Curated annotation (Swiss-Prot):
The gene is kdpC. Belongs to the KdpC family. One of its GO terms (molecular function) is ATP binding. GO terms for cellular component: plasma membrane. It comes from Cereibacter sphaeroides (strain ATCC 17023 / DSM 158 / JCM 6121 / CCUG 31486 / LMG 2827 / NBRC 12203 / NCIMB 8253 / ATH 2.4.1.) (Rhodobacter sphaeroides). This is Potassium-transporting ATPase KdpC subunit.
Amino acid sequence: MMTHLRPALASLLALSLLTGVAYPLALTGIAAVIAPDRAAGSLILREGQVVGSALIGQGFDGPGYLHPRPSASDWNAAGTFASNLGPTSAALLAEVQERQAAYEARNGASAPVDAVTASGSGLDPHVSPANARAQAARIARARGLDEAAVRRLIEAHVEPPLLGLWGQARVDVLAVNLALDAAGA
């Protein structure tokens, strides 16, 4: 039995060190050289302070800010998850209807799908252009800005599909909110 156990344990230890330590460290080192900002989490800095990440969404609920998609994890990056409610769930339907009513009351516009449904991770940093445009009037009122100026700012932050082919156009919520704050209104 020992003749089989010793090589098996040695293989387990060697592969554990290789795949659990050496490989992740090598990839982290390569990433730090090739793309240091991405290896560090794509952090966004303002005046030397981290204000967010380009990859992880965060909640904004003030009337003068662009609101993100709903988050099942309450914007907790340590515990990302979806609601796990099935498409035929009465609880999910009630949740979506509640979000829809709140969105339409806040914005005076019909709610796009991404405004009432959480993403799979619960931390999506983007909304659809339709969602962002529907919020423009509320943002302009709250900040005392011309609605056309807010719409121009939103349009300036629309990101096209990757290579024009994959995915959908999207708007980075944090980028728009930082631009709104920088505009001084």
